[in-house]
């Protein structure tokens, strides 16, 4: 529905309001009373002169509005509001954007306004009001605060305020304003205020009288001259948004100023709708209100409204109808507007009229605006000065500094004849001077993450890793994964077993009491003991360490403990990951996870339930203490009971001077040396259970259906530490059985006749005997004599109680739809997943990788969008092992949290499983634990472990073969991926943006953008890597350390690379981060992927073959080359044109997003490609598909539009008399939707010449051939019949001919020997889905242009 609007006023503010309202498709006509020359030039606008309507005759305005069906009256200046225009209009039933006379008092009567603030607790300066000059001056001289601000209580056109330098000046102002009535009756009452110190900021807000919504903060410049010198004016310039007010301060203004004011008006029964303007001083004690205004500010309006994305008519209508809380209020992010006022000579005391103005731009543009404040036109159509403030020159840019420079330059290009113009050249300077002085550029180290410390740790633990090497290990630490060669072992039919473990809250004990090596040993022992359960030999181990602040000596001791365990088990420590996450972990906090890979002969896999016989023995091997079970609750309860763990132990070890902490921290017993030789013989041990979930629970895992047993502790003493624990915490015997190992760390099933437990397993005890199950009900495990044994050791410490302990380890069900394994994966008799080596590998190399998601998790937790981080986890791990040429085979994860929330954990877990599916990997298992001592209630951490296999001859990188001249091919990233998020958090904090705020670089929220999952490159690369000769010499996953640190991992020291940033897209998120955080280009390249998620090093002769596989589906491109490194001191990575690319992207963000219409006639597959591309911010297409038009009803393309939430129209050509009439209707609808660009995507209509001319340079088509060959229809048939070797597609400008317009992009597709029309068409479609978005990007960023007069480039 189209509406008519009346705007009252004639200045720059009203010009800006009319300009913004004209952009609303709901507004058909705007009348301005009395208006101005500039307003008259705005589309849809028309001036009303005083002869038609007297601006001071309110009744006549109301009557005219009724007669002319005015839907809304917008009052610009304060005077009509103060005189009651709003009341007259409301009485006549005409919606008025602006308050009535009572509401306008908030500006019109400064005494009333100050009293109002006092009544409602709104923070403001101290004050007194006077009608007597002598009393006012006496107060100034005696006030207990600097009473130096003198204000006329009434309206004085923004000039009735004097900020005096001293009491003498203030008294002089009293004499002028009150004594001489310089501003007439406006100064008959005087307000004398305290002089506040700080920066002034304007916060304007929309209100409907019930709710109030703040606009972006702005800063006005009141003084006439540079450096805030000279007299006060109505305002000499402004900029928006103003960075001087922080987000917390803005939130305080919302609550303590705006909301209190609206509530105060409600309490005083004053109806108020329109703008509530708060002029603020940012003092050391917080924001204080200097004044309220009842209307838009001038010149703030002129820099605020260009940043408003919402429809201004909708907002104003909502204010007048009490529905402001029902509409979204959206602003352009990442853009600043700066306006410089040009005033006539003599202003503010007088104004020089009639001076000729020259240099005015011909028209406003999206980045440059001029609004008229006091400008007239003579008979010769020359622009003349016609007031004090004549016009405002405005520039918009992604950089505040650039916007200020451009606005000042624009002002300087405009001149007034005669005495010339007055304008300031320092508008906004204060903001960026303060910003640059107080906010130096952020770095990753500033955000709490020290890459150098991580590198130092790697160097420190390399010798520890080397000390664990064994037959099979290839390479060392510092690459992308750990490598192990199976051929060096003696297995005939090897099967892979995997185990993931954590040490729980025992790490809290270790950190508190500095038992770092002990807990590192624990971690390895738990994982290695787990693989023994299937009869496997532990051969390789990875660790994951997470912390708030990396302390290299501490982390090195943790790893030393792991390395000691590895040596004891003859298992190799092949790699690990250290994650420094200051926003997830407090300084000093740590957690760890471990992953062990074992190998077992297929015929030796345990358990062998099929061999069980009644009479078989349950043999228990002694534990070394509590191991790692239940420490979260143990430590919590002991602390609550005020037990001092530094006291000498009253149980084991106390006689040797050990403290309780020493005893509790005793490392987990490692059983590899004891058991592995007997497991590999395979003749006696039928089953193994590692006791980690409590003795009772783990014995249950040994019993298949049909068997039971009775555990008898008559001859099995319980270690004293369990008695002490039960006595101190008043635990029940059942809880000790269910939550702790009771002195038994491993349980075996042996034949009744076996003597193994007597001869070869020191300390082994018979716990029970297997029996056939006699009854279905009841537990298959009964226990005798345990209570008695436990009571013996508990009685010295108070005896047993009835307290229970919660389960710390959690089990999550797998989603069968997502967790379907590869065919090599199978389950043993106990349901544990194992993996056969795929038969096509002749010399298989196991490749292991681990990683986490970093503080990206914090964003998931804060936005409650937790599913996608599981995909990130898989991506980070599998992308790493791809770099060694691996085929990902399996994946395991670790999940630890503060408070167990099952639905949350399931959501995270489903994401991990989805990632494993995308990576074509079997999901093996997740170790999950609730650890309140380590994590806050809503916090969790994730670690992942990937296993892949490569043929020995296919291992990457081929370091010796990489040479200068080799080509770099880049695969684009999907955004930030999962590294550098600590720096992201620091930037968000600096700029005061929240995760639910709209992203400054897209239409999504920041949370949505930052949580886009890391791209998994398995599908992209697996086909290539599976070929014997693929031409790829190296792959570099651009992960933590960015471009600068990851590409060198696949280079010799004598080589470097030269990248060209013009050849790959820098995702806008990085341009925004750089600007918002003042991050240097070097730091950006050292922290982030900058748009390249994976870099391939390819022999020059193989480039085309590689690109044939990757260009269209993956948007791969040549991005650089390998060069000789001439200076060993210089970086191995040089990125040319990076600054230019960065500036180009930042400039793009400062511009309005282009609005695109797509015209279709059918399925709309290219429409879908355009929608997907424009909604993927990483592709950097600064545009949105806003309208879809089809000439046919019911086609699939319309469904695609509906599913994407894009408005669509069916405009059938059959309903129109001629092609020209039909096309005119298209144009009408396109203009109503404010469309900038049109894409023809299978639109089966020949467009008329007038339509083509109307949209020339903004109208493009995609054609399924390599033009100029085969224009028109049936092009695939023509190409096949002609025996062509290749075909493809062309995106071109549309002109009056048939497919003759200038070409923008072409994409070639080979024609294969067995191709028919259908197969060739399908392959061309894939090329089209690459080419069309690429062409649109060129069109949007201005690299594809065509002259309006010609049809070829």
From Swiss-Prot:
Q: How is the cofactor bound?
A: Binds 1 magnesium or manganese ion per subunit.
Kindly list the cofactors needed: Mg(2+); Mn(2+)
Extract the Gene3D superfamilies matched here. 3.40.50.20, ATP-grasp fold, A domain (3.30.1490.20), ATP-grasp fold, B domain (3.30.470.20), Formyl transferase, N-terminal domain (3.40.50.170), Phosphoribosylglycinamide synthetase, C-terminal domain (3.90.600.10), PurM-like C-terminal domain (3.90.650.10), PurM-like, N-terminal domain (3.30.1330.10)
What Enzyme Commission number(s) apply to this enzyme?
6.3.4.13, 6.3.3.1, 2.1.2.2
Query: Where are the annotated segments for GART domain?
Result: 1153-1353
The entry's ATP-binding residues are 193-196, 200, 223, 232
Q: Which Pfam family name is an example for this entry? A: AIRS_C
**Key words, A-Z:** ATP-binding, Ligase, Magnesium, Manganese, Metal-binding, Multifunctional enzyme, Nucleotide-binding, Phosphoprotein, Purine biosynthesis, Transferase
The question of whether ATP-binding is a record keyword is answered with yes
Q: Name one GO molecular function term.
A: metal ion binding
Which stretches make up the ATP-grasp domain? 114-321
**CDD domains cross-referenced by the UniProt entry:** FMT_core_GART (cd08645), PurM (cd02196)
Q: Which SUPFAM superfamilies match?
A: Formyltransferase, Glutathione synthetase ATP-binding domain-like, PreATP-grasp domain, PurM C-terminal domain-like, PurM N-terminal domain-like, Rudiment single hybrid motif
Q: Which domain of life is it from?
A: Eukaryota
**GO CC annotation, single:** cytosol
Pathway it works in: Purine metabolism; IMP biosynthesis via de novo pathway; 5-amino-1-(5-phospho-D-ribosyl)imidazole from N(2)-formyl-N(1)-(5-phospho-D-ribosyl)glycinamide: step 2/2; Purine metabolism; IMP biosynthesis via de novo pathway; N(1)-(5-phospho-D-ribosyl)glycinamide from 5-phospho-alpha-D-ribose 1-diphosphate: step 2/2; Purine metabolism; IMP biosynthesis via de novo pathway; N(2)-formyl-N(1)-(5-phospho-D-ribosyl)glycinamide from N(1)-(5-phospho-D-ribosyl)glycinamide (10-formyl THF route): step 1/1
List the residue(s) that the UniProt entry marks as the site Raises pKa of active site His: 1299
> Which residues does this entry mark as bearing Phosphoserine?
814, 816
GO BP terms, alphabetized: 'de novo' IMP biosynthetic process; adenine biosynthetic process; purine nucleobase biosynthetic process; purine nucleotide biosynthetic process
Q: Which of this chain's residues are annotated to bind (6R)-10-formyltetrahydrofolate? A: 1219, 1244-1247, 1261, 1295-1299
Question: Its quaternary structure?
Answer: Homodimer.
Q: What does this protein do?
A: Trifunctional enzyme that catalyzes three distinct reactions as part of the 'de novo' inosine monophosphate biosynthetic pathway.
Q: What is known of its domains?
A: The N-terminal ATP-grasp domain carries the phosphoribosylamine--glycine ligase activity. The central AIRS domain carries the phosphoribosylformylglycinamidine cyclo-ligase activity.
Q: Which family does it belong to?
A: In the N-terminal section; belongs to the GARS family. In the central section; belongs to the AIR synthase family.
* Name this polypeptide is given: Trifunctional purine biosynthetic protein adenosine-3
Q: Which gene encodes it?
A: Gart
């Amino acid at each position: 529905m189209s509406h008519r609007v009346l705007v009252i006023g004639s200045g720059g503010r009203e010009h800006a309001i009319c300009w913004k309202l004209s952009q609303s498709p709901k507004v058909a006509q705007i009348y301005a009373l009395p208006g101005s020359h500039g307003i008259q030039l705005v589309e849809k606008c028309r001036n009303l002169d005083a002869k038609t309507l007297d601006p001071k005759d309110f009744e006549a305005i109301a009557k005219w509005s009724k007669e002319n069906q005015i839907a809304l009256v917008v009052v610009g200046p304060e005077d009509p509001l103060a005189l009651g225009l709003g009341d007259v209009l409301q009485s006549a039933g005409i919606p008025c954007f602006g308050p009535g006379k009572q509401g306008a008092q908030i500006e019109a009567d400064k005494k009333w306004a100050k009293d109002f603030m006092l009544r409602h607790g709104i923070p403001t300066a101290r004050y007194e009001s006077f009608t007597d000059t002598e009393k006012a001056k006496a107060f100034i001289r005696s006030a207990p605060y600097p009473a130096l601000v003198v204000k006329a209580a009434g309206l004085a056109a923004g000039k009735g305020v004097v900020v005096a330098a001293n009491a003498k000046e203030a008294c002089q102002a009293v004499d002028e304003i009150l004594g001489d009535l310089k501003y007439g009756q406006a100064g008959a009452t005087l307000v004398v205020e305290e002089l506040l110190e700080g920066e002034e900021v304007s916060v304007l807000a929309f209100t409907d009288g019930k709710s109030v919504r703040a606009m972006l903060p702005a800063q006005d410049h009141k003084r006439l001259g540079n450096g805030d010198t000279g007299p006060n004016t109505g305002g000499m310039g402004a900029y928006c948004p103003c960075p001087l007010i922080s987000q917390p301060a803005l939130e305080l203004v919302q609550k303590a100023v705006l909301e209190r004011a609206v509530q105060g008006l409600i309490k005083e029964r004053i109806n108020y709708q329109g703008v509530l303007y708060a002029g603020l001083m940012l003092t050391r004690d917080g924001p204080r209100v200097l004044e309220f205004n009842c209307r838009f500010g001038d010149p703030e309006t002129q820099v605020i409204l260009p940043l408003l994305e919402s429809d201004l008519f909708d907002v104003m209508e909502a204010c007048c109808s009490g529905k402001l809380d029902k509409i979204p209020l959206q602003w352009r992010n990442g853009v600043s507007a700066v306006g410089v006022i040009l005033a006539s000579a003599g202003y503010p005391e007088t104004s020089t009229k009639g001076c000729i103005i020259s240099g005015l731009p011909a028209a406003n543009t999206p980045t440059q605006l001029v609004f008229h404040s006091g400008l007239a036109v003579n008979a010769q159509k020359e622009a003349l000065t016609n007031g004090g403030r004549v016009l405002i020159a405005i520039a918009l840019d992604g950089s505040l500094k650039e916007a200020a420079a451009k606005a000042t330059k624009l002002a300087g290009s405009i001149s007034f004849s005669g005495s010339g113009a007055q304008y300031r050249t320092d508008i906004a300077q204060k903001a960026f001077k303060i910003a640059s002085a107080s906010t130096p550029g952020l770095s990753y180290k500033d955000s709490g993450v020290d890459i150098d410390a991580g590198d130092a740790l790697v160097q420190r633990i390399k010798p520890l890793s080397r000390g664990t090497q064994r037959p099979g290990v290839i390479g060392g630490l510092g690459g992308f994964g750990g490598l192990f060669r199976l051929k060096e072992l003696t297995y005939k039919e090897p099967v892979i077993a995997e185990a993931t473990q954590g040490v729980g809250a025992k790490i809290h004990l270790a950190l508190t009491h500095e038992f770092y090596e002990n807990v590192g040993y624990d971690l390895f022992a738990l994982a290695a003991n787990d693989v023994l359960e299937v009869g496997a030999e532990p051969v390789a181990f990875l660790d994951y360490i997470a912390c708030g602040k990396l302390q290299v000596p501490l982390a090195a001791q943790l790893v030393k403990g792991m390395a000691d365990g590895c040596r004891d088990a003859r298992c190799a420590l092949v790699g690990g990951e250290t994650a420094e996450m200051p926003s997830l972990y407090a300084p000093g906090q740590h957690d760890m996870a471990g992953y062990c890979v074992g190998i077992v002969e297929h015929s030796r896999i345990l358990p062998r339930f099929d061999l069980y016989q009644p009479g078989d023995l349950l043999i228990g091997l002694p534990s070394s203490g509590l191991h790692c079970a239940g420490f979260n609750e143990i430590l919590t309860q002991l602390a609550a009971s005020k037990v001092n763990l530094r006291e000498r132990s009253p149980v084991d070890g106390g006689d040797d001077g050990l403290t309780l902490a020493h005893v509790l921290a005793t490392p987990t017993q490692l059983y590899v040396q004891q058991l592995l030789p007997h497991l590999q013989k395979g003749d006696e041990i039928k089953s193994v259970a590692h006791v980690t979930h409590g003795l009772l629970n783990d014995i249950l895992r040994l019993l298949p259906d049909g068997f039971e047993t009775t555990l008898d502790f008559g001859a099995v003493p319980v270690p004293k530490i369990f008695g002490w624990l039960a006595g101190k915490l008043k635990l029940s015997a059942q809880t000790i059985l269910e939550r702790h190992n009771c002195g038994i760390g491993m349980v075996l099933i042996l034949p009744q006749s076996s003597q193994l437990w007597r001869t070869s397993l020191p300390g082994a005890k018979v716990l029970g005997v297997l029996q056939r199950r006699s009854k279905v009900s009841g537990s298959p495990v009964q226990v005798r004599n345990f209570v008695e044994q436990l009571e013996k050791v508990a009685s010295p410490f108070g005896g047993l109680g009835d307290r229970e302990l919660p389960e710390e380890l959690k089990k999550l069900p797998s989603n069968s739809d997502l967790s379907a394994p590869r065919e090599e994966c199978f389950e043993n008799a106990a349901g544990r997943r194992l993996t056969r080596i795929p038969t096509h590998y002749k010399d298989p190399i196991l490749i292991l990788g681990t990683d986490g998601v970093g503080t990206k998790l914090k964003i998931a937790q804060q936005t409650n969008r937790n599913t996608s981080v599981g995909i990130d986890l898989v991506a980070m791990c599998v992308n790493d092992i791809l770099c060694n040429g691996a085929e990902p085979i399996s994946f395991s994860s670790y999940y630890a949290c503060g408070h167990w929330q099952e639905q949350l954990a399931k959501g995270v877990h489903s994401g991990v499983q989805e990632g494993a599916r995308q990576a074509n990997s079997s999901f093996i298992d997740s170790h999950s634990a609730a650890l309140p001592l380590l994590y806050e209630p809503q916090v969790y951490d994730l670690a992942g472990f990937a296993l892949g296999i490569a043929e020995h001859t296919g291992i990457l990188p081929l370091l010796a073969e990489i040479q200068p001249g080799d080509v770099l091919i880049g695969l684009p990233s999907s955004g930030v991926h999962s590294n550098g998020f600590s720096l992201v958090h620091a930037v968000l904090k600096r700029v005061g943006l929240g995760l639910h705020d709209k992203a400054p670089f897209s239409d999504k929220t920041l949370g949505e953008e930052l949580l886009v999952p890391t791209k998994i490159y398995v599908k992209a690369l697996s086909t290539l890597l599976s070929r014997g000769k693929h031409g790829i010499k190296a792959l570099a996953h651009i992960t933590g350390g960015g471009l600068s640190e990851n590409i060198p991992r696949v280079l010799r020291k004598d080589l470097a690379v030269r990248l060209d940033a013009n050849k790959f897209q820098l995702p806008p998120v990085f341009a925004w981060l750089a600007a918002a955080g003042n991050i240097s280009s070097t730091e950006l390249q050292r922290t982030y992927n900058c748009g390249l998620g994976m870099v391939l090093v390819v022999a020059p002769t193989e480039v085309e073959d590689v690109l044939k596989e990757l260009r269209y589906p993956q948007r791969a491109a040549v991005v650089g080359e390998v060069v000789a490194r001439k200076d060993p001191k210089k970086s191995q990575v040089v990125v040319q044109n990076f600054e230019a690319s960065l500036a180009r992207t930042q400039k793009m963000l400062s511009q309005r997003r282009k609005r695109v219409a797509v015209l279709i006639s059918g399925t709309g597959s290219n429409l879908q490609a355009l929608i997907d591309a424009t909604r993927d911010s990483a592709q950097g297409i600064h545009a949105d598909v806003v309208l879809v038009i089809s000439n046919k009803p019911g086609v699939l393309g319309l469904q695609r539009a509906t599913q994407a939430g894009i408005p669509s129209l069916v405009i059938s050509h059959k309903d129109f008399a001629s092609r020209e009439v039909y096309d005119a209707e298209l144009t009408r609808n396109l203009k109503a939707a404010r469309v900038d660009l049109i894409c023809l995507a299978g639109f089966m209509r020949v467009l008329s010449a007038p339509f083509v001319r109307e949209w020339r340079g903004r109208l493009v088509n995609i054609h399924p051939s390599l033009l100029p060959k085969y224009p028109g229809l049936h092009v695939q048939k023509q190409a096949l019949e002609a025996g062509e070797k290749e075909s493809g597609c062309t995106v071109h400008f549309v002109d009056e001919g048939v497919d003759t317009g200038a070409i923008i992009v072409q994409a070639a597709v080979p024609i294969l020997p067995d191709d028919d029309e259908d197969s060739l068409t399908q392959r061309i479609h894939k090329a089209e889905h690459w080419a069309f978005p690429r062409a649109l990007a060129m069109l949007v960023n201005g690299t594809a242009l065509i002259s309006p007069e010609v049809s070829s480039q």
